[in-house]
Amino acid sequence: MQKRCGWVKMNNPLYIAYHDEEWGRPLHDDQALFELLCLETYQAGLSWETVLNKRQAFREAFHDYHLQGVADMTDEELEALLDNPAIIRNRAKIFATRANAQAFLQVQAEFGSFDTYLWSFVEGKTINNDVPDYSQAPAKTTLSETLSKDLKKRGFKFTGPVAVLSYLQAAGLVNDHENDCEWKSRNE
């Protein structure tokens, strides 16, 4: 049996696939980075499992996370999403998705890509942490606090240091797979 991080819910195939195929792998595609940022914002106050279970519905609701399409969504379109039972119907999070798309586009214009901007915070290299037990890992770090402040300054919403650390881990900038997880070395 393969050894995974202790946080993986082994009774949920979406969770297992997310850990095995996505979490912690260095991500450099701007559209994928945007989708992941949105998913992390939806998680605030909820379980990651809830977000994963609604992921496809979010894609459908937000134009497959095509940046310009999301940035151009009208208030009426966003309000209509509040009636969609397939997604998390939190008004602030729904409207934050559009605001984050607009801020994301501004970062792309300034840096050439969001990828260039984001990875500059780790000098282009994944930080590999010593994590014997993920439950003992910090909820935020100096890096996540620094990036959070910069994102907020640029107009991003729901990007506090805890959500940002989760984003950095998921996007592979920080490798926090547990030391005995078989995926730790695959992402170094």
Predicted regions and their residues:
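HhH-family (HhH-GPD) DNA N-glycosylase catalytic core used in base-excision repair
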Residues: 1-188
